[in-house]
């Protein structure tokens, strides 16, 4: 089995891990409903690009 010739220091390990980060989801303001929704997706109220596409799930 392959074994590293030298010990990986904390600094080297942490510098490598700086690239592991989360990206914030892109959200856009929907003027029809007044809510924010993800890009290219139907809003929670059933609107897409200002048009009613689907029925919204009503809370009972």
From Swiss-Prot:
One of its GO terms (biological process) is translation. Keywords: Ribonucleoprotein, Ribosomal protein. Residues 1-22 are annotated as: Disordered. Pfam families: Ribosomal_L32p (PF01783). Residues 7-20 have a biased composition (Basic residues). GO terms for molecular function: structural constituent of ribosome. InterPro entries: Ribosomal_bL32, Ribosomal_bL32_bact, Ribosomal_zn-bd. GO terms for cellular component: large ribosomal subunit. Belongs to the bacterial ribosomal protein bL32 family. NCBIfam families: rpmF_bact (TIGR01031). PANTHER family: 50S RIBOSOMAL PROTEIN L32 (PTHR35534), LARGE RIBOSOMAL SUBUNIT PROTEIN BL32 (PTHR35534:SF1). This is Large ribosomal subunit protein bL32. It comes from Streptococcus pyogenes serotype M1.
């Amino acid at each position: 089995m392959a074994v590293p010739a030298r010990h990986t220091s904390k600094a080297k390990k942490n510098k490598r891990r700086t690239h592991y980060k989360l990206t914030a989801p892109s959200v856009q303001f929907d003027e029809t409903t007044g809510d924010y929704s993800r890009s290219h997706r139907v809003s929670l109220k059933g609107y897409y690009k200002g048009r009613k596409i689907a029925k919204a799930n009503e809370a009972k």
